[in-house]
């Protein structure tokens, strides 16, 4: 990301694969669920490929070992209860922020603009995970996949966040690692920023107009560096 960004009044972030690497704990919960159900475990890389649409969808995918199929409703219910019970108690055993996450958030906070979380993870789990990682105080709003009637790739969470903050969605950045983040941002009229260190393949996503982010970064501090010219102009 090498050009100044102007008129930004808020920055929204995805959580898993953007601020932190949570796959080890998500995969451990999947393994515990499968073991309890008498099923074979899946490699962590497979679980990683299923992340991004909320835990309900993740459980379907893990149980069927397929991105698009849904498990039998009775099996899914047992699996979901098992998964949630384990995951709630093991949110941050292995989950850690990416190396420059906290530095990037601190720099952005110094600009005086609000930071928000827009994730498809359940809101209560997202809030607790941020607390356990020591990141909760950076954010003025947390929206989870169950906070509103629709979640990403719907633009509703982004538009709702902008409304709560009292700004135009066009003045908010959406930072994420997946197609859901980019599609939601485009539909809401936000500038989309893709990260190269998450679970999504930015090279692949950039090949399609519908999933090509407006900017791509390799570390969160790059956002601050490109907002600095805006701050300097505002202070003149």
Curated annotation (Swiss-Prot):
One of its GO terms (molecular function) is metal ion binding. CDD domains: HAD_PGPase. Keywords: Carbohydrate metabolism, Hydrolase, Magnesium, Metal-binding. SUPFAM superfamilies: HAD-like. PANTHER family: PHOSPHOGLYCOLATE PHOSPHATASE. Its cofactor is Mg(2+). The active site is at 14 (nucleophile). This is Phosphoglycolate phosphatase. Mg(2+) binds at residues 14, 16, 177. It catalyses: 2-phosphoglycolate + H2O = glycolate + phosphate. Belongs to the HAD-like hydrolase superfamily. CbbY/CbbZ/Gph/YieH family. It comes from Neisseria gonorrhoeae (strain ATCC 700825 / FA 1090). It comes from the Bacteria.
């Amino acid at each position: 990301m090498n050009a100044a960004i102007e008129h930004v009044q808020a920055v929204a972030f995805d959580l898993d694969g953007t601020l932190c690497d949570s796959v080890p704990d998500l995969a451990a919960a999947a393994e515990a669920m499968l073991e309890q159900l008498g099923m074979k475990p899946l490699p962590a890389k497979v679980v990683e490929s299923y992340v991004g649409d909320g835990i309900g969808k993740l459980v379907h995918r893990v149980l069927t070992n397929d991105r698009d199929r849904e498990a039998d409703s009775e099996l899914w219910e047992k699996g979901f209860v098992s998964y949630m019970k384990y995951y709630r108690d093991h949110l941050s055993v292995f989950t850690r922020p990416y190396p420059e996450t906290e530095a990037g958030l601190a720099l952005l906070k110094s600009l005086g603009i609000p930071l928000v979380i827009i994730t498809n993870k359940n809101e209560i789990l997202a809030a607790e995970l941020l607390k356990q990682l020591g990141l909760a105080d950076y954010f003025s709003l947390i929206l989870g996949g169950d906070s509103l009637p629709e979640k990403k790739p719907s633009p509703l969470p982004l538009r709702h966040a902008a409304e709560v903050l009292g700004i135009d969605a066009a003045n908010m950045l959406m930072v994420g690692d997946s197609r859901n983040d980019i599609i939601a941002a485009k539909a809401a009229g936000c500038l989309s920023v893709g990260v190269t260190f998450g679970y999504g393949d930015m090279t692949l996503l950039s090949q399609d107009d519908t999933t090509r982010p407006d900017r791509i970064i390799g570390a969160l501090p790059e956002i601050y560096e490109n907002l600095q010219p805006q701050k300097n102009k505002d202070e003149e």
